[in-house]
């Protein structure tokens, strides 16, 4: 099995252009013949998109997937936080609403959510097909 390669894009804060840079890289690599898929383990976004299975993911991840000629899927964005107010967010796990929590309560679940925050070598994202 050919080993996949990963690239991580990091920024200094919110709204600094990470999503746009990743979308551009997805398009460039896809046009060069590589199969690319975005993966953002956790995202905070007010608006979301519903994929072909009826599951939610962030619109930014959708733009990145489409830039790479991939079908947007919720497993590309396993944890989505949708703010309800200044104090709490709806927590969406694998595309489904799980619960609403403030920051303290969300972090109390962090051990349960940790498995979602990385890709292992057999993750479905690495092997899915159109």
Protein language model features and the residues they cover:
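Flexible phosphate-sensing "switch/lid" loops adjacent to ATP/NTP-binding sites
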Residues: 1-130
């Amino acid at each position: 099995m050919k080993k996949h390669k990963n690239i991580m894009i990091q920024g200094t804060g919110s709204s600094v252009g990470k999503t746009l840079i990743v979308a551009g890289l997805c398009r460039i690599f896809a046009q060069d013949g590589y199969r690319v898929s975005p993966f953002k383990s956790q995202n905070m976004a007010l608006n979301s998109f519903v994929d072909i299975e009826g599951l939610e993911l962030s619109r930014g991840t959708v733009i990145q997937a489409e830039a790479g000629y991939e079908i947007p899927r919720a497993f590309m964005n396993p944890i989505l936080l949708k703010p309800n107010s200044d104090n709490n967010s709806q927590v969406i796990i694998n595309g489904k609403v799980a619960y609403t929590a403030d920051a303290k309560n969300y972090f109390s679940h962090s051990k349960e959510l940790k498995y979602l925050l990385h890709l292992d070598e057999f993750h479905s994202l690495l092997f899915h097909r159109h």
